[in-house]
Regions:
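Active-site mouth loops of central-metabolism enzymes
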Residues: 22-34, 99-115, 141-143
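N-terminal binding-site loop/beta-alpha segment at the start of enzyme catalytic domains
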Residues: 1-80
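Active-site groove signature of glycoside hydrolases
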Residues: 122-141
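Structural preference for beta-strand elements that scaffold enzyme active sites
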Residues: 13-17, 50-51, 78-82, 129-134, ...
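Short, acidic/polar
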Residues: 31-44, 110-124, 172-177
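Beta/alpha (TIM)-barrel catalytic core signal, keyed to glycine-rich beta->alpha loops juxtaposed to Asp/Glu
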Residues: 3, 138-327
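N-terminal small/glycine-rich loop or linker at the start of catalytic domains
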Residues: 9-28, 82-104, 134
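Acidic (Asp/Glu)-rich catalytic clusters
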Residues: 8, 70-76, 123-126, 179-183
Length: 327
């Protein structure tokens, strides 16, 4: 199976990773069957999905705890494990991020907070190192949390062998350059799908220049690109889909019309629409890592099918043209 580098690190991994936000449960995702999610993570590794991504804020530590339980039953060397730092609810800071299930979550990118985050994550995950550590959200006030301090803390953790690669999520091109100026940056994690392509112009040129990998989250646009959503599909009050621009009537119709053009390709490649979309998304940007969420073995198996799709050049060109036409 073809593998991709993670930035300038020595880590190589297949393009498809497993996101575990939903495994955290809570009001965003509802109750979670933890035993089933442990099996889902095991299934992912068995199917060749080696990059498992989590974060402390997913379920307020719950996702990390479930991932840690799964790792007890998996050869650690077979897993590329990433988590995040910089969101804090152990104490209050001047920067409120959001309220999650009644808990006020703050941003804190100080060296002390980052080091404490990593030590706590290592304990919950039951491992002695992280393959990738992301800063989850960036500070809106670099006077409060200087980027140099943030990067130096991560570089120190790398020197200690507690992390292998440095990542950042939800960044700007200027911040990417700042990370590299003060230390290094191997990978960024950003929202990217066939419907949400802003990073192609805003971030990708800088990443290419500096040898930084990109990992895309939400490639199926919260399920809109799976082929299972219709114009009549509704979502519960409070669902983030209701405020997602891609789910608004005009854009939703564009998305569904786009998928309808590819029905013949799902037959040709004997795959689901979701698998076809994942395979194409991986082709949109050379070397792109794609992160797909799942919390059941069945969902994992559906995502993993994308690893076996080898798009013909002509089909890829046709599909990219279709995508460009609605961008």
């Amino acid at each position: 199976m073809e593998k991709l580098n993670i930035g300038r690190s020595s880590i190589e991994v297949p393009f498809l990773g497993m996101g575990t936000w939903a495994i955290g449960g809570g009001s965003w995702w509802g109750d979670n069957d933890d035993a089933l999610s442990v099996k889902a993570i095991q299934t992912a590794v068995e199917q060749g999905i080696r990059w498992i991504d989590t974060a402390p804020i997913y379920g307020l530590y719950h996702s990390e705890t479930v991932v840690g339980e799964a790792l007890k039953h998996i050869d650690r060397d077979k897993v590329v494990l990433s988590t995040k730092c910089g969101l804090e609810w152990r104490h209050e800071t001047p920067v409120l991020h959001k309220v999650v299930d009644g808990t006020a979550v703050y941003r804190d990118l100080s060296a002390q907070s980052i080091i404490e985050d990593v030590e706590d994550s290592l304990r919950r995950l039951g491992t002695d190192h992280l393959d990738v550590l992301y800063t989850h959200w960036q500070s809106p006030d670099l006077g409060l949390y200087p980027l140099e301090e943030t990067v130096e803390a991560m570089m120190k953790l790398k020197e200690q062998g507690k992390i292998r690669a440095i990542g950042a999520s939800n960044v700007t091109a200027d911040l990417i350059r700042g990370y590299c100026r003060y230390g290094q940056l191997d990978v960024i994690q950003e929202k990217y799908s066939l419907l949400t392509r802003r990073i192609e112009k805003q971030l990708l040129p800088t990443c290419r220049e500096l040898g930084i990998s990109v990992q895309a989250y939400s490639p199926l646009e919260q399920g809109l690109l799976t082929g299972r959503v219709t114009m009549e599909t509704t979502f519960p009050e409070g669902s983030t889909r209701n405020s997602n621009p891609s789910f608004q009537p005009a854009r939703r119709k564009q998305a569904l019309d786009l998928l309808a053009k590819w029905d013949d390709l799902t037959e040709k490649y004997d795959c689901t629409m979701a698998q076809l979309v994942i395979a194409l998304t991986a082709r949109m940007i050379p070397g792109l890592h794609v992160l797909c969420g799942a919390r059941t073995p069945e969902q994992v198996l559906d995502n993993a099918g994308a690893l076996n799709i080898k798009l013909d050049g002509a089909d890829a060109v046709r599909m990219k043209w279709d995508v460009d036409a609605i961008s």
